[in-house]
Amino acid sequence: VAYKLNEEKKNTTDEEQTNVVKEDDIGKEIKLGIAEFDTMNPLLSKNKQVQEITKIIYEPLFQLTSDYKLEKCLAKDWAKTAENKYLIKIDTSIKWSDGNNLSVDDVIFTIENLSKIDSIYLENIRHITEINRVDDNTIRLILDQEVPFFEYNLIFPILSKKNYEGQDFIYGSSNNAP
């Protein structure tokens, strides 16, 4: 998390003001007004408010633009190599809020755990039968059949594997905070 959202600034003049975040404040805290939350894990949450809020915390491999075009987010590049095979390069220069770099292990971890839980994103990965690490920044997805525009399914949030190490994915303490 790279924003401090709890400061409210009042505009006492007619001039437009910008909210400047000081470097010392980055990553300190977020205060959210939610009636009730079930979990802060975006893959597990059934709460629409939590799902919307976690969109500013977690990012997907791809995202949709306002005109519904696919745009790279955590993915650096991708290619459909056969009717049912995709290669995806991850942008490993992206850092998590703890300073660790995004890795293919995070993507594999997310997809593997997503396949084991009841999630709003389960349908997105239903056709993935294999996920292989090609190298430090590339994964191969193999599907059980050709799925037209499959890359549009890769819009679910990616989680940090290191953040969940040694914990139960569903009940671990990492689900209590972003």
Where are these regions (language model features)?
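N-terminal, intrinsically disordered, polar/charged segments of Gram-positive cell-envelope systems
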Residues: 7-39, 52-55
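N-terminal lobe/hinge region of extracytoplasmic solute-binding protein
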Residues: 33-81, 112, 176-178
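Aromatic- and charge-enriched surface segment that lines or borders ligand/interaction sites
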Residues: 77-118, 134, 140
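Solvent-exposed loop/turn segments at secondary-structure junctions
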Residues: 37-39, 68, 94-95, 146-149
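Solvent-exposed, non-transmembrane alpha-helical starts
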Residues: 98-101, 149-154
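Gly/Pro-rich hinge or "lid" segments in bacterial periplasmic/extracellular proteins
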Residues: 154-178
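Sec-dependent N-terminal signal peptides of Gram-positive bacterial secreted proteins and lipoproteins
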Residues: 1-6
